[in-house]
């Protein structure tokens, strides 16, 4: 078995981050993920999550489980000597750390995606990414350090808390999958340089919103239903749905609707990290028009339609969307 530490120090990482910086970051992520997993387990015993505390910047209810996970990740990430600041889906503004003038990197995170389903024992996840700052070393960081397109990410990944705890990440040199070993209390390599399978097996979309979809999306769904080789699978947990489609071969769709005209998923915290993993696994992503990774963000909490999966399935859904654009 190859541990996460052994893997990092025995393989080349990208030119933007040293092995020491990468490993020290993953020590923090690994430790925090263990704590978050315990929060989730305790949630089903003590119901720590049930009370809806307040609404976040997106107008969504935050639960105690959201707030605990968010605080823990912020407190842990700020201990990394080279990270200047963090932006979280649960925070209105980015947070700078005391080492902001000299930290090389900025960190973005969705601390607990799918948390509202945690009490149903549905798999939930943490999504994260890392960028090099664009402001000069020696000055305070600013919002422009965070407002970079997804193709500028130097690391992205997610942790899936399910039947096992899984870490999936890329440093732009392939996608690597690690599984947490509870006896050794660390992650071990499960799959190296993983790519989507060649078959297109699954489409994942919330069809309860069907009446609010554009004609192109409706036609695409109909084409999937008419194909006996494609099945529909949807849990409502982005990380769980994407991970299944990555392993089995498929596409995840969250289009804009009449209610969410600009989409609902967050570009910086959800779409970009997942899109980079998809790209590195020989897949693709789109907002229905252009590659997600090529979008220049204008605001920190920007939303976007999101289509991510195998290249052929993403290409086809783009074709349907553009083909029926003037018929909506």
UniProtKB/Swiss-Prot annotation:
Classification via SUPFAM superfamilies: Carbohydrate phosphatase
Binding site for Mg(2+) 2: 110, 113, 270
Annotated Gene3D superfamilies: 3.40.190.80, Fructose-1,6-Bisphosphatase, subunit A, domain 1
Keywords, sorted A to Z: Carbohydrate metabolism, Cytoplasm, Hydrolase, Magnesium, Metal-binding
Pathways involved: Carbohydrate biosynthesis; gluconeogenesis
Transmembrane segments: none
Coiled coil feature spans: none
Residues annotated to bind Mg(2+) 1: 89, 110, 112
One GO CC term, this protein: cytosol
E.C. designation(s): 3.1.3.11
Pfam families, per the entry: FBPase, FBPase_C
UniProt: substrate binding residues: 206, 234, 252-254, 264
GO molecular function: fructose 1,6-bisphosphate 1-phosphatase activity; magnesium ion binding
Alphabetical list of InterPro entries matching this protein: FBPase_C_dom, FBPase_class-1, FBPase_N, FBPtase
The reaction(s) this protein catalyses: beta-D-fructose 1,6-bisphosphate + H2O = beta-D-fructose 6-phosphate + phosphate
Enzyme class at the top of the EC tree: hydrolase
Intracellular or extracellular location(s): Cytoplasm
Cofactor mode of binding and number, as noted: Binds 2 magnesium ions per subunit.
Cofactor(s) required, per the database record: Mg(2+)
Biological processes, Gene Ontology terms: fructose 1,6-bisphosphate metabolic process; fructose 6-phosphate metabolic process; fructose metabolic process; gluconeogenesis; sucrose biosynthetic process
Quaternary data: Homotetramer.
Protein family per UniProt: Belongs to the FBPase class 1 family.
Record's protein name: Fructose-1,6-bisphosphatase class 1
Origin species: Wigglesworthia glossinidia brevipalpis
Gene behind this protein: fbp
């Amino acid at each position: 078995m190859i541990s996460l530490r052994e893997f990092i120090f025995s393989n080349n990482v990208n030119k933007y981050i040293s092995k020491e910086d990468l490993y020290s970051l993953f020590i923090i992520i690994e430790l925090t993920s263990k704590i978050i997993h315990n929060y989730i387990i305790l949630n089903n015993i003590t119901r720590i999550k049930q009370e809806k505390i307040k609404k976040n910047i997106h107008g969504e209810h935050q639960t105690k489980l959201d707030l605990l996970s968010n605080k823990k990740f912020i407190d842990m990430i700020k201990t990394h000597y080279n990270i200047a600041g963090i932006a979280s889906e649960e925070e209105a503004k980015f947070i700078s750390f005391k080492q902001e003038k000299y930290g090389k990197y900025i960190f973005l995170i969705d601390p607990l995606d799918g948390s509202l389903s945690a009490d149903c024992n549905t798999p939930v996840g943490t999504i994260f990414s890392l960028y090099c700052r664009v402001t000069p070393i020696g000055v305070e960081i600013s919002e422009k350090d965070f407002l970079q397109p997804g193709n500028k990410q130097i690391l992205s990944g997610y942790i899936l808390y399910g039947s096992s705890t899984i870490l999936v990440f890329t440093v732009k040199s392939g996608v690597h999958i690690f599984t947490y070993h509870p006896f050794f209390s660390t992650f071990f390599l499960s799959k190296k340089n993983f790519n989507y399978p060649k078959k297109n097996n699954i489409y994942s979309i919330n069809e309860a919103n069907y009446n609010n979809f554009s004609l192109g999306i409706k036609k695409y769904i109909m084409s999937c239903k008419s194909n006996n080789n494609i099945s529909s699978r949807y849990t409502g947990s982005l990380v769980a749905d994407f991970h299944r489609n990555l392993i089995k071969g498929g596409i995840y769709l969250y289009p804009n609707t009449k209610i969410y005209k600009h989409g609902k998923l967050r570009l910086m915290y959800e779409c970009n990290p997942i899109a980079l993993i998809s790209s590195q696994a020989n897949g693709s992503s789109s907002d229905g028009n252009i590659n997600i990774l090529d979008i220049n963000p204008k605001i920190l909490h920007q939303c976007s339609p999101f289509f991510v999966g195998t290249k052929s399935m993403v290409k086809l859904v783009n074709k349907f969307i553009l083909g029926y654009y003037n018929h909506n």
